[in-house]
Amino acid sequence: MKISFVLLLTLFICSIGWSEARPTDIKCSASYQCFPVCKSRFGKTNGRCVNGLCDCF
């Protein structure tokens, strides 16, 4: 029971960062097009193209 709780807690803590994507209104066709957009708007180059729009995280 303790092991299950620890695993569940670890998964929860690790998943916190995954849900911090910031959608933008910039259209894209590939993720590399989002890198300069994310850098200029949020200061980070982490981004991806999702459904034709850039998501920065």
From Swiss-Prot:
Q: Name one GO molecular function term.
A: ion channel inhibitor activity
Look up the record and report any one GO term of the cellular component aspect: extracellular region
Tissues where this protein is expressed:
Expressed by the venom gland.
Cell location: Secreted
Q: Which residues form the signal peptide?
A: 1-21
The disulfide bridges present are 28-49, 34-54, 38-56
Listed A to Z, the keywords are:
Disulfide bond, Ion channel impairing toxin, Neurotoxin, Potassium channel impairing toxin, Secreted, Signal, Toxin, Voltage-gated potassium channel impairing toxin
Protein's UniProt keywords contain Calcium: no
Enumerate the Pfam families for this protein.
Toxin_2
Its main subcellular localisation, reduced to a broad class, is secreted
Role: Blocks human and/or rat Kv11.1/KCNH2/ERG1, Kv11.2/KCNH6/ERG2 and Kv11.3/KCNH7/ERG3 by binding to channel outer vestibule (S5P domain) with a 1:1 stoichiometry. Also has a minimal effect on rat ELK1/KCNH4 potassium channels. Has been shown to weakly inhibit Kv11.1/KCNH2/ERG1, Kv1.1/KCNA1, Kv1.2/KCNA2 and Kv1.3/KCNA3 voltage-gated potassium channels.
What's the domain remark here?
A: Has the CSalpha/beta fold, which comprises one or two short alpha helices connected to anti-parallel beta-sheets stabilized by three or four disulfide bonds.
Q: Which family does the similarity line name?
A: Belongs to the short scorpion toxin superfamily. Potassium channel inhibitor family. Gamma-KTx 2 subfamily.
- This protein's name: Potassium channel toxin gamma-KTx 2.2
Tell me which species this is from. Answer: Olivierus martensii
